[in-house]
């Protein structure tokens, strides 16, 4: 685990003075439960803190970057940048899921790629960096991995609307979303959806809701139409999401 932590710190560009904070941020509740640890030893409290830090930093960034943007538009843009789907997208760039401490069941059922798990861990890492190195270091991490390439993230966030407009302009066939698979208990559902133009599949997506899975499928569909492949994303990594 020590080697993995060192590698992760190289990837994110921050060296922890207290590596235990990073381990804490990577500890999912399923792992803590499996070890019969106290609930405070999982990453949920750090996630809570990181969420607050992320909101402050992203708000400050938008306020100073888009000086003529009205409050309502800034609110919408911030929501698109810090929502669970986008955070899962950003976490996959690292890829953060590879470093998580998960319970065996969570790991076997795809927890390392589950959007809710990796997006929560992303916020927990922000919280850990804030505690270890202060607001400036947390800000640097957020700018590097979340507030970069905003236009691309906006495309992801608005993918269903954009794909609909593209298909209406270029094709005669109807755009259709089909549910491929639904699994998991009611409190932790997972959906897989494909999107088709007529009978031709152009993208697939996973998510905790059908709407979220459709969003990811639409994004992959846009990439397929524009670039001929369904996974042209930031740093060429596939994404999954949920909202």
Where are these regions (language model features)?
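Double-stranded RNA-binding/processing signature
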Residues: 1-243
């Amino acid at each position: 685990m020590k080697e993995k932590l060192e590698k992760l710190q190289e990837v994110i560009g921050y060296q922890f003075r207290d590596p235990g904070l990073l381990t804490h941020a990577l500890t999912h509740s399923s792992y803590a439960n499996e070890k019969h640890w106290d609930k405070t030893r999982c990453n949920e409290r750090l996630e809570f803190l990181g969420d607050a830090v992320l909101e402050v930093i992203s708000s400050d960034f938008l306020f100073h970057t888009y000086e003529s943007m009205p409050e309502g538009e800034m609110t919408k843009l911030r929501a698109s940048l810090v929502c669970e789907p986008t955070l899962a997208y950003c976490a996959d760039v690292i890829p953060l899921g590879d470093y998580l401490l998960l319970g065996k069941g969570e790991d076997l059922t795809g927890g390392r790629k589950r959007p809710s798990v990796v997006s929560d861990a992303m916020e927990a890492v922000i919280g850990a960096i804030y505690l270890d190195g202060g607001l400036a270091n947390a800000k640097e991490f957020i700018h590097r991995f979340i507030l970069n390439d905003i236009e691309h993230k906006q495309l992801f966030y608005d993918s269903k609307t954009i794909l609909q407009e593209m298909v209406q302009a270029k094709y005669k066939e109807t755009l259709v979303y089909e549910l491929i698979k639904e699994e998991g208990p009611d409190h932790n559902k997972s959906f897989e959806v494909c999107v088709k133009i007529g009978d031709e599949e152009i993208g697939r997506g996973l998510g905790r809701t059908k709407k979220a899975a459709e969003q990811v499928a639409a994004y992959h569909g846009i990439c397929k139409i524009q670039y001929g492949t369904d996974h042209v994303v930031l740093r060429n990594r596939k994404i999954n999401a949920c909202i």
